[in-house]
């Protein structure tokens, strides 16, 4: 339990009830939701915030001990005390706080009798001057010991001081003390005194009457005696001068202002001197001021009267009781009024003097006697009776001649025997110095019964330690006069009778008188003896009292000296105390500041601790992440090592490829030289062509005559259509996952007879084509280029291919007949499995060549079946539609609709497909002299090393040659390869399907000079013509047999598709013949002098395929690694054929490098046709002369 939470039992019960009220949610603690309870105290939010922070030691809630501390702090704030925990420790009991709408702690406010008697005893103890009051200064000291705050004690004083006279009587003191005790018990002070408290505090003395109140400015007689004695010792001439009074008064330690006021009050008649009673007034005022009592502004009348020696205090306090004659005879000692001063310095008790008289019963002369009682007082003093009333003077009888004797003994009568003995008893003298008189009783003869009764006033005077003499005149004068005795008259009558008797002469009764005197003398002696003994006793007691007085004075001097020393020590201690208080105050301020700093630092520490915990958690997370990263780093390093090894392997491959590149460049340079030589030869051939044109015109006439003769001879035979070699089929199609079947149709041109009478120089008949637009810029008609082919046979030892000219286009076709299913595989650079179609632009003419590069070649006997199936290609996008063979009309014109016109097989552009990419086939008539001697050009192409296959280009994925020679079906720039399901060495036939890998195969055959019907010099002799006629007849029979198999052959071999993933095909529209419903599509890739992927000029677009859709295998948008399949045809273990390196992109344009080697005048290599079906592909290359500026509808 917290030390600050300790409360009295009454408060504990009340605070527990308050805790139950404040705990709204009944969870046993005061949380933030319950903190609104403290707003009932009406304190500010700042004070309540400080109270909460001091009470809250559990960080967010208060338990019951913390709640008690908070209530104490609220009460301190309401009282105006500092709101600190130290304030709780300094105040023993803090009253409950005042809360709105909450009842306070209940109290009945009734004082029990036992408790009230304790308060009365305290009042009597602290009422030092015995005036029945406790002044404010005394109350401050008394009540300050309770430890309650000054503000609370001030409230208690205001409640208790009912009379508002700035002092408390006994009843008010009882109420004030009870209120203090109630606060210490834990009760709250009331705003006004309850009636029950006033009723229960009423004080009744033990005598049954309320306690008397001594007048405020009454000087007690003991004090007056002391002041008078002090005056007698220091007075000069019965007065006190101002200088003497100043020296004496300054010893009191009062201020000059108070001493001046005391002088003015004492010197009431402004005489500037002090007599005895003024001196007593001044000393009494000094005594009261030192006790803390305020000085009056004017001299009270009671103070002036009580300073005189003749003042009777009994007349102020209570009148003396008067006894009746009967009661006075029975009562020997009346009640005495005692006055207590309460001052420890004085031990004086003043008793009222009470006189008792007893009359003498006999009429005879009886002397009056005074009885003396001497009860011992508490102080050891003596009780002195009042003075005995003086008896009348008696004269001794005249018969006695002795002179009158006077008894001066103290306490006895004086008998005067002089005067002739007339007076028997002399009148005792009155002495002021006599303070005690002992009465005696004259013993009469036994015959006379005498009654002795006391006849004196009893007064008891106690001599204290402060008196200077045992006997004092003032004591006698200040005593009230004795009450007259009832026996005074008889005594006087007896005395008068005696006196009268003494005046008479001596009678016989003188004897009796003498005897009477003797008896009186005896009585005197007895009385004297008794008085002597008693006087001795009194003297012993007096000596004792004087000795005691001297000792007390000596002790008083010592005490006074010690008192002065103590005062000096007190002053020094007060100075030290004030300095200590100042130090304590500064320390308290420092402590409060330190506590504020501690609170702020504590909050900062908590924030830093929370931040440290967060940073620690973050550090752990980062450390764990770092460990994971280290693990990943190790793995990556291992992968890096592997990649480095692979890179080293690849670098070795690159070095070998670079070496191959060097070889290729050397070959290209060689080819370039050959091309330049070919250009010169072509120029010579062009000149020769012009010469032959003249001869051709003459021969045409002879040819027409021969044709007429042949027609007559062949009436019984069916005409055989011989396909002219000048028909160039640029049929190219790409099927995506479909198979298109097109049948190539052999279009007969003319039947050349082997008659020796055939005039070579006669012009054969020309069949004109139907009217078609001759320009692609005509608006009315669709442009369909039409040309007529004239067949001219020449003999050439190196090449037996037929060279045809049509519209200035020089074309040669190398037909190949497939006789075996699969030819022998070899690593030769030139294969002979396919037809070669090449085109060159020479003097405005276009020379095309269909080359198929393949290292697997076969040598076979050439058959001039110009309608061979190898040269029929499926149209692009045929969608697996099969078209029957179509025979051209008499005009022999074939049109191709690229714009969706016509029927037949549908190409992807909506037009019908036909095998002839140039439209209608030409007739056998020759329009111009374009068929000059071009055998040398054909021979050049056959011998051109550019088209020879090098092992380095067979299957290598060289970045500089993969576009021409790599085996792929996807984009080589990271595209995914497909499996090669067929052997690259397969030759296109009815039984085998070419490989789907994009392989450029050079399909060529060895020439057979014996099968060439025409000499190379274009001049025929009779022997050669006869052999030619025989061969033509055999060829016609073979052609008839082959015409029956075109459909089957086309179905097996012409389903070619291509999916090289370049998505960069350019289409070239060709004319369409609506009558024949045929369509021919030609498109190709132009390798211009631009970087791959640059689609700014429309040459390439790697982002979309031919259908306009995004390529699924775009190497720049997919991270799919290439899946390779090893080449099973790599029989020779060519390291560049079967290897799968990852060089999927060309670092520079092929054309650029090619042109750098060849030169700007060399023709650019362009892929004219790419056809791939499933696993088959084929390609045709077109060489365009850049120097030819003649516009063509097929120019890209």
UniProtKB/Swiss-Prot annotation:
Top-level lineage group: Eukaryota
GO biological process, one term: protein transport
Main location class: membrane
Domain EF-hand stretches: 10-45, 46-77, 114-149, 254-289
Membrane topology: Peripheral membrane protein
Bias (Polar residues) ranges: 341-356, 403-417, 430-440, 912-932, 1106-1133
SMART domains: EFh, EH
Residue intervals of the EH domain: 11-100, 115-204, 223-310
Endpoints of the signal sequence: none
Low complexity bias: start-end ranges: 324-340, 357-378, 441-478, 485-511, 734-751, 977-1009, 1019-1081, 1160-1196
Listed Pfam families: EH
Record keywords: Calcium, Cell membrane, Coiled coil, Membrane, Protein transport, Repeat, Transport
Entry coiled-coil feature ranges: 512-718
Subcellular location: Cell membrane
GO cellular component, one term: clathrin coat of coated pit
Region (Disordered): 309-511, 733-755, 790-810, 822-852, 905-932, 976-1082, 1101-1133, 1157-1196
InterPro entries: EF-hand-dom_pair, EF_Hand_1_Ca_BS, EF_hand_dom, EH_dom
CDD domains: EH (cd00052)
GO terms, molecular function: calcium ion binding
Function: May be involved in clathrin-mediated endocytosis.
Record's subunit section: Interacts with tom1.
Protein name as annotated: Epidermal growth factor receptor substrate 15 homolog
Originating organism: Dictyostelium discoideum
Phylogenetic placement of the source organism: Eukaryota, Amoebozoa, Evosea, Eumycetozoa, Dictyostelia
């Amino acid at each position: 339990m917290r030390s600050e939470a300790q409360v009295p039992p009454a408060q504990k019960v009340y605070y527990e009830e308050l805790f139950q009220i404040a705990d709204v949610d009944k969870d046993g603690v005061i949380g933030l939701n319950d903190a609104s309870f403290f707003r009932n105290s009406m304190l500010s939010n700042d004070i309540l915030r400080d109270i909460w922070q001091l009470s809250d030691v559990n960080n967010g809630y208060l338990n019951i001990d913390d709640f008690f501390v908070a209530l104490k702090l609220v009460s301190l704030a309401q009282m105006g005390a500092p709101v600190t925990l130290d304030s709780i420790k300094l105040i023993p009991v803090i009253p409950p706080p005042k809360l709105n709408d909450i009842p306070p702690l209940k109290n009945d406010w009734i004082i029990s009798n036992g408790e009230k008697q304790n308060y009365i005893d305290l009042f009597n103890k602290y009422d030092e001057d015995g005036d029945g009051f406790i002044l404010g200064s005394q109350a401050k000291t008394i009540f300050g010991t309770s430890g309650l705050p000054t503000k609370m004690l001030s409230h208690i004083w205001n409640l208790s001081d009912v009379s508002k006279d700035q002092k408390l009587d006994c009843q008010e003191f009882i109420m004030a003390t009870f209120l203090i005790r109630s606060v210490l018990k834990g009760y709250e002070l009331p705003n006004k005194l309850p009636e029950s408290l006033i009723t229960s505090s009423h004080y009744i003395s033990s005598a049954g009457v309320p306690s008397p109140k001594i007048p405020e400015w009454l000087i007690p007689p003991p004090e007056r005696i002391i002041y008078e004695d002090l005056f007698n010792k220091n007075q000069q001439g019965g007065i006190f001068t101002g200088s003497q009074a100043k020296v004496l008064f300054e010893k009191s330690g009062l201020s000059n202002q108070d001493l001046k006021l005391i002088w003015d009050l004492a010197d009431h008649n402004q005489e500037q001197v002090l007599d005895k009673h003024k001196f007593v007034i001044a000393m009494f005022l000094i005594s009261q001021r030192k006790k803390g009592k305020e000085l009056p502004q004017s001299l009270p009348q009671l103070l002036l009267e009580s300073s005189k020696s003749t003042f009777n205090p009994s007349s102020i306090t209570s009148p003396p009781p008067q006894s009746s004659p009967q009661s006075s005879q029975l009562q020997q000692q009346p009640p005495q009024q005692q006055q207590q001063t309460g001052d420890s310095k004085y031990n004086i008790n003043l008793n009222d003097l009470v006189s008792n008289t007893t009359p003498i019963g006999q009429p005879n002369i009886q002397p009056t006697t005074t009885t003396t009682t001497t009860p011992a007082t508490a102080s050891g003093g003596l009780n002195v009776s009042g003075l005995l009333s003086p008896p009348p003077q008696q004269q001794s009888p005249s018969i006695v001649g002795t002179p009158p004797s006077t008894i001066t003994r103290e306490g006895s009568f004086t008998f005067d025997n002089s005067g002739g003995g007339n007076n028997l008893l002399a009148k005792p003298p009155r002495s002021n110095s006599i303070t005690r008189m002992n009465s005696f009783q004259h013993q009469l003869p036994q015959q006379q019964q005498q009654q002795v009764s006391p006849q004196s006033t009893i007064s008891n005077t106690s001599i204290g330690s402060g008196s200077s003499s045992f006997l004092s005149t003032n004591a006698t004068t200040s005593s009230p006069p004795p009450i007259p005795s009832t026996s005074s008259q008889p005594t006087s009558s007896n005395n008068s009778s005696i006196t009268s008797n003494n005046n008479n002469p001596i009678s016989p009764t003188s004897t009796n008188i003498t005897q009477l005197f003797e008896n009186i003398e005896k009585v005197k002696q007895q009385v004297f003896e008794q008085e002597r003994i008693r006087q001795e006793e009194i003297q012993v007691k007096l000596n004792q009292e004087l000795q005691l007085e001297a000792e007390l004075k000596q002790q008083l001097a010592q005490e006074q000296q010690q008192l002065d020393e103590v005062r000096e020590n007190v002053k020094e201690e007060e100075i030290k105390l004030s300095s200590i208080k100042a130090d304590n105050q500064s320390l308290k301020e420092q402590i409060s500041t330190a506590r504020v700093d501690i609170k702020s630092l504590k909050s900062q520490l908590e924030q830093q601790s929370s931040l440290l915990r967060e940073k620690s958690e973050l550090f752990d997370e980062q450390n764990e992440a770092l460990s994971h990263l280290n693990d990943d780093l190790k793995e990556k390093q291992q992968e890096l090592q592997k990649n480095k090894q692979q890179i080293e392997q690849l670098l070795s491959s690159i070095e070998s490829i670079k070496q191959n590149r060097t070889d290729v460049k050397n070959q290209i340079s060689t080819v370039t030289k050959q091309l330049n030589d070919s250009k010169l030869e072509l120029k010579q051939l062009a000149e020769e062509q012009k010469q032959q044109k003249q001869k051709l015109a003459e021969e045409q006439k002879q040819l027409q005559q021969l044709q007429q003769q042949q027609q007559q001879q062949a009436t019984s035979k069916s005409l055989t259509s011989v396909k002219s070699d000048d028909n160039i089929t640029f049929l190219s199609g790409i099927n995506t996952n479909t198979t298109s079947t097109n049948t190539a149709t052999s279009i007969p041109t003319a039947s050349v007879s082997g008659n020796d009478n055939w005039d070579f120089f006669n012009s054969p008949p020309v069949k004109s084509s139907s009217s078609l637009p001759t320009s692609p810029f005509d608006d009315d008609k669709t442009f369909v280029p039409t040309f007529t082919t004239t067949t001219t046979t020449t003999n050439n030892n190196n090449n037996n291919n037929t060279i045809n000219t049509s519209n200035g286009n020089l074309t040669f076709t190398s037909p190949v007949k497939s006789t075996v299913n699969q030819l022998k595989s070899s690593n030769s650079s030139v294969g002979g499995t396919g037809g070669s179609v090449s085109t060159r632009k020479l003097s405005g003419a276009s020379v095309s060549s269909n080359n198929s590069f393949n290292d697997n070649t076969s040598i076979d006997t050439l058959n001039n079946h110009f309608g061979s199936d190898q040269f029929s290609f499926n149209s692009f996008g045929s969608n697996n539609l099969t078209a029957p063979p179509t025979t051209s009309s008499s005009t022999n014109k074939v049109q191709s609709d690229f714009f969706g016109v016509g029927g037949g097989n549908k190409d992807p552009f909506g037009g019908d497909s036909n095998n002839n990419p140039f439209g209608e086939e030409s007739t056998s008539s020759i329009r111009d002299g374009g068929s000059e001697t071009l055998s040398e050009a054909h021979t050049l192409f056959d011998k051109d090393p550019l088209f020879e296959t090098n092992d380095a280009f067979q299957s290598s994925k060289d970045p500089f040659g993969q576009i021409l020679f790599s085996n792929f079906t996807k984009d080589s720039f990271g595209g995914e390869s497909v499996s090669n399901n067929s052997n690259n060495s397969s030759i296109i036939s009815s039984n085998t399907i070419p490989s789907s890998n994009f392989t450029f195969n050079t399909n060529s055959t060895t020439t057979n000079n014996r099968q060439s019907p025409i000499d190379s010099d274009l001049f025929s002799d009779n022997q050669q013509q006869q052999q030619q006629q025989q061969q033509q007849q055999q060829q016609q029979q073979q052609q008839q047999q082959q015409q029956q198999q075109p459909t089957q052959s086309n179905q097996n071999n012409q389903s070619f598709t291509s999916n090289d993933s370049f998505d960069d095909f350019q289409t070239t529209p060709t004319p369409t013949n609506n009558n024949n419903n045929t369509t021919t599509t030609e498109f190709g890739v132009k390798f211009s002098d631009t970087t791959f992927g640059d689609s700014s000029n429309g040459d390439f677009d790697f982002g979309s395929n031919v259908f306009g859709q995004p390529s699924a295998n775009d190497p720049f948008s997919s991270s799919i690694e290439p899946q390779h399949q090893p080449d099973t045809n790599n029989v020779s273990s060519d390291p560049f054929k079967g290897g799968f390196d990852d060089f999927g992109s060309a670092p520079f344009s092929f054309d650029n490098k090619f042109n750098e080697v060849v030169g700007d005048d060399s023709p650019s290599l362009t892929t004219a046709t790419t056809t791939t079906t499933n696993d088959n592909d084929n390609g045709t290359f077109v060489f365009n002369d850049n120097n030819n500026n003649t516009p063509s509808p097929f120019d890209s």
